[in-house]
Regions:
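Interdomain "pre-motor" coupling segment immediately N-terminal to P-loop NTPase/helicase cores
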Residues: 19-70
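Solvent-exposed alpha-helical segments within well-ordered globular domains of core cellular machineries
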Residues: 7, 11-14, 23-26, 41-45, ...
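Extended interfacial segments that mediate partner engagement and assembly in macromolecular machines
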Residues: 54-108
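Intrinsically disordered, low-complexity and often Lys/Arg-enriched segments
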Residues: 1-11, 248-256
Length: 256
């Protein structure tokens, strides 16, 4: 039995990986017929729908691959709550040109001031620009590095980390590092120097980073590389999370 044209078309579109074509071609054909649009306009509109949907799927895939703990945008950040933060610089960074230049970003501030939110927002902006992003806490990264070293797959993990155009390392300084952990993390920073962008959030000022790495020599060498091409976001102030919690408590509740 010969397949109908509709069945053949569906097969061809699936083979060509054009799911939006397959889903929309019949409905759009009816619309174009009603509007008197010719076949060129019909195909152009169908191709545009496919491109829009493909870009959406690519962004979603990059977000999944980034392993964000949550998806947060800069639009939802209350910049007024952290007056020390340079909003114009953040918005400039959201254009992601610093990633093309392989520059770094460091967000410094006491706990709860929204550093992770800003990092997530800039990471999301990079995904939307078509860039590859990886997100991980410093403690988790060191754990993965040490585990990979013990299992003799450290080189493979280092190569995987090097593929990210932007590597976000969150919460540096929350947990002191062992000598081995500090050296492994230093290698990550060193390997990305002028090759790929790093974004770091930390609750400690630079002069206290020796407490993290345990060695003035190692800390000095790391800061020399990290701050050579860097944008620093100062985020000291009252807890951003506490302010947001207060606002939610004060907002009138919708009656049941």
């Amino acid at each position: 039995m010969t397949d109908t044209p509709q069945v053949l078309l569906a097969h061809h579109l699936k083979t060509l990986r054009l799911p939006t074509f397959l889903r929309e071609y019949d409905k759009l054909a009816r619309q174009c017929a009603a509007e008197g649009a010719d076949h060129v306009r019909y195909l152009a509109r169908l191709a545009e729908l496919e491109l829009i949907d493909r870009e959406r799927r690519m962004v979603e895939r990059r977000i999944r691959q980034a392993r964000f703990p949550a998806v947060k945008s800069l639009d939802s950040f209350d910049f007024k709550a952290i007056p020390s933060l340079n909003k114009m610089l953040v918005l400039e960074l959201a254009r992601c040109e610093y990633i093309e230049r392989r520059e770094n970003v460091i967000a410094l501030g006491n706990s709860g001031t929204g550093k992770t939110h800003i990092a997530l927002g800039l990471g999301l902006a990079a995904c939307q620009k078509g860039l590859s992003v990886g997100f991980i806490t410093a403690a988790a990264l060191v754990h993965e590095l040490m585990e990979a070293r013990d299992e003799k797959r450290l080189l493979r993990l280092q190569r995987q980390l090097a593929k990210y155009q932007l590597l976000i390392i969150d919460e540096l300084g929350f947990v002191p590092l062992s000598k081995t952990g500090a050296e492994l993390l230093f290698e990550v920073f060193s390997q990305r120097y002028e090759r790929g962008s790093i974004m770091v959030t930390s609750n400690l000022p630079f002069d206290e980073w020796t407490e993290i790495f345990g060695s003035e020599r190692l800390t000095g060498a790391l800061l020399d590389r990290l701050t050579h091409h860097v944008h620093i976001l100062e985020m000291n102030g009252e807890s951003y999370r506490l302010n947001q919690s207060r606002k939610r408590q004060k907002s009138p509740k919708t009656p049941a």
